[in-house]
Amino acid sequence: MEGTDPVNKKLAAALSGGAVLVLALSGCSDDSNDKLNSWAKQVCDKVQPQAKKIESANAAIQKETSDNSAPADVQKTDSKAFQDMSDAYKAIGDAVDKAGAPNVDGGEKKQQDAVKELDKISTSYADLKKQVDKLDTDDQAKFAEGLKGIAGSLDKLSQSGSDALKNLEEGDVGKAMAKQESCKSASATPSGS
């Protein structure tokens, strides 16, 4: 199984890069804007379970790849993980959509851009699931080659998602989100620091 091992590691690394963007909803500040705070709470409460789902999907892929598993097992795990991620990003997009525009300058554009990006990421993960499902698990070299292509797509995907949310979380929106307990616990760093 040595043939696919470096590729699997690359895949796992690309994936964890993608998950970081959802888990990056933390920072610190304390200005008061009730409307914005209630918007942030609404989004954060919805994001938290999805962030956990993405984290679990990542963990599953990393476990499968570090165990030097057979191609068929890697395929099965990756396929489920990509489906979970697709669902999670769709749900986060829906949450941002339903929350309406945050009460800041240009809030509507920020919101719409983020929703558009999140939906696009959801679709991209669904496409990766289809790609991984089609890989030939009987031919190890071909399987490794296919995974390499998927890892490349993931790199791009994590970057675009990161940009979408970075934009939404700029300024007061990010500060309001940082104060929400659910966003703190969804973040990759332990709260209480």
Specify the residue positions occupied by each region the protein language model found:
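Bacterial N-terminal signal peptides that target proteins for export
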Residues: 2-16
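C-terminal motif of bacterial Sec signal peptides marking the signal peptidase cleavage site
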Residues: 23-27
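Immediate post-signal-peptide N-terminus of mature secreted/exported proteins
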Residues: 30-84, 185-192
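Extracellularly exposed regions in secreted/surface proteins, prominently low-complexity, repeat-rich
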Residues: 33-51, 141-193
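Short, charged, amphipathic alpha-helical segments
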Residues: 37, 41, 72-83, 108-115, ...
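Long amphipathic alpha-helices with heptad-repeat character
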Residues: 47-54, 58-61, 82-85, 118-121, ...
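Short, solvent-exposed, charged loop/turn and helix-capping segments
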Residues: 90-115, 128-140
